[in-house]
């Protein structure tokens, strides 16, 4: 049995199948950990969703910002944006089944010495607190309040956490941290303007995982979202978004020995 963590797929179904072939994946024996952003921008989100559902318990995934965007569009809360490739999912005969499956995925997964999350964790969150906060928002996503909340889900404020936050502000901070964050101030305030390489992070900001006092630093965080960061491996960090949808590559790391597997994502 092996566990393969895989970076942002974004509708790249063919490359996903190529990666499974490369690693010799066996659904009766092995497990896949997916960092989220399963859908959108790529050519075949519909087939990818269907394949993941067919794989059943072999798949553990967390929601990314594009996955939440699909759910918000499907709820009628927001319109599609330029570059979205979600229409085939929305028009599919089994659309309700696909969306219901997606809606019931996690924001945060903690197992043994690993955490799986799409973007990151705020520095003042312990693993235990992050788990509780994620479950709080998962309840919203799966319930009747999501349609209303999703209209304002992605505002940039508040930009930091404090325990007094309530309602939509509270849920927005949790979602922003777990699905959108890349950098913070040294005090833990999120900044969403920086999307480039590590070398381009401006003075006064740090990658969220380099905040010295980060409460989760002793746990290995597996994440994606930051394609300009690319494959980034440190003792307690596995970053996996290598820009498949931008014709980079699709990356998997086998957690047991950190062996790296990659397939090029050139479009034909």
From Swiss-Prot:
Keywords: Hydrolase. Its EC number is 3.6.1.41. GO terms for molecular function: bis(5'-nucleosyl)-tetraphosphatase (symmetrical) activity. The keyword Hydrolase applies. It catalyses: P(1),P(4)-bis(5'-adenosyl) tetraphosphate + H2O = 2 ADP + 2 H(+). The keyword Hydrolase applies. It holds the Pfam family Metallophos. Belongs to the Ap4A hydrolase family. Hydrolyzes diadenosine 5',5'''-P1,P4-tetraphosphate to yield ADP. This is Bis(5'-nucleosyl)-tetraphosphatase, symmetrical. It comes from Nitrosomonas europaea (strain ATCC 19718 / CIP 103999 / KCTC 2705 / NBRC 14298). The gene is apaH.
């Amino acid at each position: 049995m092996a566990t393969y963590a895989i970076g942002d797929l974004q509708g790249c179904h063919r490359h996903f199948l190529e990666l499974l072939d490369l690693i010799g994946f066996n659904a009766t024996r092995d497990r896949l950990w997916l960092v989220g952003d399963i859908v959108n921008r790529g050519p075949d989100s519909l087939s990818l969703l269907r394949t993941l559902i067919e794989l059943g318990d072999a798949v553990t995934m967390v929601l990314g910002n594009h996955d939440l965007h699909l759910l918000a569009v499907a709820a009628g809360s927001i319109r599609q944006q330029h570059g979205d490739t979600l229409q085939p999912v929305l028009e599919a005969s089994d659309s309700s089944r696909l969306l219901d499956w997606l809606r019931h995925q996690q924001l945060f997964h903690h197992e043994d010495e690993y955490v799986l999350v799409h973007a990151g964790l705020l520095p003042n969150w312990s693993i235990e607190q992050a788990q509780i906060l994620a479950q709080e928002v998962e309840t919203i996503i799966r319930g009747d309040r999501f349609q209303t909340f999703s209209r304002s889900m992605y505002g940039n404020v508040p930009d930091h956490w404090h325990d007094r936050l309530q309602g939509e502000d509270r849920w927005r901070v949790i979602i922003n941290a777990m699905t959108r964050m890349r950098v913070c101030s040294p005090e833990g305030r999120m900044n969403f303007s920086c999307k480039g390489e590590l070398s381009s992070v401006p003075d006064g900001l740090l990658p969220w995982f380099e905040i010295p006092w980060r409460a989760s630093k002793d746990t290995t965080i597996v994440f994606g979202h930051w394609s300009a960061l690319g494959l980034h491996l440190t003792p307690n960090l596995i970053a996996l978004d290598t820009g498949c949808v931008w014709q980079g590559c699709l990356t998997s790391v086998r957690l047991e020995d950190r062996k790296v597997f990659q397939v090029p994502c050139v479009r034909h």
